């Protein structure tokens, strides 16, 4: 292999598998310009691979329970069709978005974990605390819309990136809801990744199965970990809505949700704090 070939391989790896920065962070990138289902899937795969894990349970990576300093975060660079770029900071212990950077200004959610993240990422920038936290309950409340009424897809992602790039405060909560599902939730579930791929050309609202999976990630993660020492059986069934819109119970690891769908497990040591995070309110302003 000649030097040019080696260089090209390194460039490709840097795009799809993450590049360590001077701060020790890892950056994964996705641009809508020239994108298709293959490039999006490669991006989601690279995002999953960038998350450190504590081993596999039933062939599913188990996220680490904790990690210190800047290593707790990866950076996710997103560009829209016009080439506008934003960079999101993602907590590797739960795939939770902490905030984002555009040009020289960083925006962080109004919550304890995001304020901690601001001490390690986007250093040397003008830092702004958003007037809300990053959990679904709060974002939907501020947006005055539920997730099942907000379209997803490449056009929706393009609009979301533009909204945050120019920071339209009225539309920002909806933009975050689109970004979270298009990136973090797609990394957690193959089904949600496919939902986005099915919406490349035309934006549509997510189906109830996708919303159900999003809501039950911590419970599914917990029961899969319990099943490891319980002959593959869940201690408590997890109720989800399937792709036919029917409420069903997942009771063991032979379920397709476990074998073909869930791609990351939230560590059981973090489940209580994650659930508190999901329903938390904003921090009081000083």
Curated annotation (Swiss-Prot):
Keywords: Antiviral defense, Glycoprotein, Hydrolase, Plant defense, Protein synthesis inhibitor, Signal, Toxin. It holds the Pfam family RIP. Residues 1-21 form the signal peptide. Its EC number is 3.2.2.22. The active site is at residue 185. One of its GO terms (molecular function) is rRNA N-glycosylase activity. Gene3D superfamilies: Ricin (A subunit), domain 1, Ricin (A Subunit), domain 2. InterPro entries: Ribosome-inact_prot_sf (IPR036041), Ribosome_inactivat_1/2 (IPR017989), Ribosome_inactivat_prot (IPR001574), Ribosome_inactivat_prot_CS (IPR017988), Ribosome_inactivat_prot_sub1 (IPR016138), Ribosome_inactivat_prot_sub2 (IPR016139). It comes from the Eukaryota. GO terms for biological process: defense response to virus; negative regulation of translation. It is an enzyme of class 3 (hydrolase). This is Putative ribosome-inactivating protein.
């Amino acid at each position: 292999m000649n030097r040019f070939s080696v260089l090209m391989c390194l460039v490709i790896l840097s795009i799809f598998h993450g590049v360590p920065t001077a701060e020790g962070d890892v950056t994964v990138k996705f641009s809508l310009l020239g994108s298709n289902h293959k490039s999006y899937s490669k991006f989601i795969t690279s995002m999953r691979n960038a998350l450190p894990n504590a081993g596999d349970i039933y062939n599913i990576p188990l996220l680490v329970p904790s990690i210190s300093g800047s290593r707790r975060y990866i950076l996710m660079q997103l560009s829209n069709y016009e080439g506008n770029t934003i960079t999101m900071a993602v907590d590797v212990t739960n795939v939770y978005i902490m905030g984002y950077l555009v040009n020289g200004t960083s925006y962080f959610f109004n919550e304890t974990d995001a304020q901690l993240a601001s001490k390690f990422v986007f250093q040397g920038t003008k830092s702004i605390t958003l007037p809300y936290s990053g959990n679904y309950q709060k974002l939907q409340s501020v947006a005055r819309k539920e997730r099942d009424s907000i379209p997803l897809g490449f056009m929706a992602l393009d609009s979301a990136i533009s909204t945050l790039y120019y920071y339209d405060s009225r539309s920002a909560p909806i933009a975050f809801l689109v970004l979270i599902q298009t990136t973090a939730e797609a990394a957690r579930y193959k089904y949600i990744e496919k939902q986005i791929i099915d919406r490349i050309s035309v934006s549509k609202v997510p189906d109830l199965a996708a919303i159900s999976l999003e809501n039950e990630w911590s419970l599914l993660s917990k029961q899969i970990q319990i099943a490891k020492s319980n002959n593959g059986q869940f201690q408590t069934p997890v109720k989800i809505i399937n792709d036919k819109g029917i409420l069903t119970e997942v009771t063991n690891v032979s379920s397709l949700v476990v074998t073909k769908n869930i791609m990351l497990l939230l560590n059981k040591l973090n489940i209580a704090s994650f659930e508190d995070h999901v329903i938390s309110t904003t921090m009081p302003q000083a």
